[in-house]
Structure formats: C-alpha cells, structure tokens
C-alpha cells in the first residue's frame, strides 16, 4: 500500500510543474508521485527534477498528455524532510530591475519567475545586494516584495544601496532588508563568491 500521489499541472507552463512537484515531494518524500503535464518542456523539466532527487522516472504518453511517475529509491535518504535550510556561499548582486538584455518587458517577466524559483530553490544565497534600479524591487509597491520578504524570512541577508535608494527617491519606501553602502558591497565583491544579475 505505497502512498501514491498525483500532481495534475496540465495547462501550466514552467516553472510551475516543477515547483508543484517539488512541494509534493518535500511533503511526502516516500510517496510515488505521478505528475501530469501537457507539453514537452514541462515533461523534460519534471524528469530532470525527478532524477536530480534520485527518483526512478517512468514516462507514459497519452494523447498530448505526459504522465511522469517518480518512484523513490529505497537506498537514498529522503532529502528535504528534516534537513535545515541549505545556504550556498554565493552572494547575488542585482544591478537592475529586469533580467538579461534585449527586451526590458521580457526581462521584467523573467524577474518575476526568478524570485519564485529562488524561494523554491533548495539552496539559497547567503546575501543579495541591490544596486542601481534593482533597488525598486525592495520597496513597498514592488511586485517582487512578497517573494523577497520570504527569502529574508528564510535567513537570506537582503541589503539595498543607500545612494541608489536616494537617487530614485524611494529610501522611505524600503520594504525589506537593510540599507548598505558601496564600501560594504565592494568589500563583498572582492572577498566573496559573487553572481551579478
């Protein structure tokens, strides 16, 4: 009488199928999980997730739907159930309020997805610094504030550049984290494992 659970995410685009599967996996590490998706990108991403977690993954296609059945391997310790939050040694330097180059509109949508994925990720950065226009993401009316607050609640250090907040006239609107300066940020860039976005 193995515990079997179904995650039906047909009609959803990435990263939602992986996020929903991960939630069920975290809560039920011993269960056999069948995720149903209706596109190949989601199928591939859920399969990668299952294999990264040590599941045996079987895929069955029915029309345009894909059924991915993930069976836990008994010899693997179920991960995520009792372990403390894991922090990487990375510091993220956010330099603007959209991701990538080419299209700002696309970049703003990507940024929303980025913060959702960051909240769901197993390994968190130790700190996130915000400079230039990225400081707009940590003010009270930001669409990203809720997810960035979740990261702060999970122990990620959030710090925004004071000069930048002043420049955009939003210092009084800071909604999460602390105010820092370029000296501290430069110190971190020179001494820590920095990822610039």
Enumerate the predicted regions with their spans.
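Ordered, small/hydrophobic-rich secondary-structure cores
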Residues: 1-46
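Short internal beta-strands
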Residues: 34-37, 125-132, 157-162
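Short, structured protein-protein interaction patches enriched in aromatics and acidic/basic residues
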Residues: 37-45, 129-138, 143-144, 151
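A glycine-rich helix N-cap at a beta->alpha junction
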Residues: 56-60, 144-168
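A generic structural motif
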Residues: 65-71
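Short, charged/polar, Gly/Pro-enriched secondary-structure boundary elements
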Residues: 74-80
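Conserved mixed alpha/beta catalytic, RNA-binding, or beta-rich assembly cores of soluble enzyme
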Residues: 83-141
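C-terminal binding/interaction regions
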Residues: 179-182, 188-196
